[in-house]
Amino acid sequence: MGKKLNAAQKEAVCHETGPMLVLAGPGSGKTTVLLCRILRLLEKKLARPREILALTFSKAAADEMKERFLRAKGPEGVSFGTFHSVFFRILRSKYGWGVERVFQEEERRNVLRHIIEEAKWDIPDMEEYISQFFSQLSLMNSELESPKTFEPTGIPVEEFRKLYNAYERYKERHEKLDFDDMLTLCYQLLNEDAEVRAYWQGKYKFILVDEFQDVNKAQFECLRILAEKHRNLFVVGDDDQSIYAFRGARPDFLLHFPTLYPDAKKVTLNTNYRSTERVISLAEKVIENNETRFVKNMKGIGEEGDKVTFFLAEDTAKEAECIGEKIAKLLDEGVPLTEIAVIYRTNLQGGAFARELYKRGIPYDLRDNSGNVYEHWVAKDLLAYLLLAENEESDGGLRRILNKPKRYIGKDLLAEAETMPYNLMRSLFVCPSLKGWQEEHLENLRTDLNHVRKKSPYDGLKYVRKVIGYDEYLEEFAAYRRTSAQVLWEIADEIMETAKDCADVTMFRQRLEDLSQQIKEQTQKKGQKRKGVSLMTMHGAKGLEFRAVFLPSLVEGVVPHEKGLEEIEEERRLFYVAMTRAGEKLCLSAIKKRYEKETKPSRFLAEMGLDAEKFFT
């Protein structure tokens, strides 16, 4: 392929038969190794093109690998594909299924929406709820678990099971299957049909897997069966970059590979061609705190590079401002927009940097597309409170927040009020069936709304959350949904942050609309060539590289994230992935206050030898 291989790469490429585990650290040239190995198998006549299967996780990665292989004068006939595409091919060969059987994403969401509407469930966050159901369904299927024993998060168990049964009935009735079925049905078929199993085991003499640390149980079991006859399973991955536990991916299969295949050869690609020595050495200091891992002792190619920098800002807004300044300076120095990235822990953090770059006229790309916080139901609730305080005749606003927190105004009373000729608030007060204690709740709401009206949007929202009790409502809602209230509180915090310097409700509402519109425009750019500074989550940054990387808000509760503290090793891997995206420049930062609360420096800073405490005191 025109590239000189180092000793470890050569060892992996020249391996002939039997299982092999290639531990490939960041920037170590794993794709080159995979492609060179395929070319060598063909050159040495160990296999014909059609006897080789190369598997990866995304269609883009599979297409790129195939393109590079053909550019290197590789012959046609080698199978490059995703797990889903290959498993569907196996199912199609048995059942003759066409692609029209496969549920498209929007189609299956519509089906679930219809099921929920038929059941007359009151779901305040329908789209999020549907996403959560499918995310938990995928997790269950990837673990090959039964719905009878699976314990979902973010959705009550009984609701999950009812939806699951209705969804399965719909698929059966309409002869449909989704992406999860491709894994589970393929596993069943390979497990139960000896003829099919023998055919596919004979078909592929050599199987190569990229990003092996990301396999889930269903994928691994299918792989194990397919490779059983020839045992030429060549897997490439890095346990230190296993960051998709929420999808069922586990580093265990990689870590236990030598146990599952005692005759497996193991080689470590520990030369990072991407990052400078300084970046590599700091990243190593962090990741070596994980106990469950293979030691790799990553090294660079001798370029020490710029010092990794650190600064402490007062709060998120100041941090974003400082990063904005540094980005402007990099652009002046000739660093291209597309070679700069701000990588944060959660989607919520992106707003501050988007606002700052927008203000400076610096183009940016929001690379994660998972929801618009400014259109989240919590944002809509909070805005509804402010609008209702301004104008008691906002019937839509009152309907929205009437029982948030509980005021025990039931559907029957609401229906009765809606037959009256007045606005909804007044109608409720004059309903003949209104009980004294319900009237008291309404009086309290009216009094509270009067207080809110006299305050700035920021102080008004604080009153809604702390005095009226909206935060307690979020806590109850989270408990019912088997999820963390922290995430919902942080959304409310972010909306309050947006209100900070708004003089009135009109200005606040306009700001929410503008920010929401910016996110919609970014979403429409999906799939287009990137032209701006990349703003993305640590999960979204996997597999990418940049000359300059900023890692903001390195404080406890954010990095590592509050909800990831039980899985501290996964949080550390996530931070390691983020650090190793940097080629030349890495800038770390922390904040003294987040959403008005004092913070503590991230433990990862101490692990890399930075005494951040002295900055904080």
Where are these regions (language model features)?
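Helicase P-loop NTPase motor core
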Residues: 26-34, 263-265, 270-363, 389-391
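Conserved helicase core region in the C-terminal RecA-like lobe
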Residues: 79-87, 208-211, 236, 507-565, ...
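A basic/glycine-biased coupling hinge at the interface between accessory DNA-binding modules
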Residues: 17-18, 28, 39-190, 194-202, ...
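Hydrophobic anchor at the beta1->P-loop junction of P-loop NTPases
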Residues: 22-24
